[in-house]
Amino acid sequence: MGLEDKPDLVAGLITTRDASERPADEGEGLLAHVAEVTVIIENRGDAIAGETTTRFWITGGDIDQELRVIQTPPLLPGAEVEVTALWNMRGLDGQYDIIVTADAFSQLEEMRKDNNAAVAHVVVRGTRVELV
């Protein structure tokens, strides 16, 4: 298998959405202190990327822990998928880094591995989370 016929998963832009930003119909069942953390995973390679694992990690304050691990579906070359984790921010005022890693457990042989992670710096104030 040559370099040109491998998948290449990329963790792209990380976004957050707290209760104040959720339309009422989408927030049904979600508590006010729960935020959504979403990343776009894209296959920039030239081969199909099989099912993999995307890991969300939170660090800052007294926290350095896995938030969630999500099975990510197979992706054709050029395809992308949004992957979302829920974050319980109750009592977590302060600054945090959210690190999201595509193919977190190196399940695929990829063109590159240095583009699998993305980081977002956020500030939590009560039930609000803001990118900084």
Outline where the language-model segments fall.
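Extracellular/luminal regions of secreted and cell-surface proteins that mediate adhesion/ECM remodeling
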Residues: 1-132
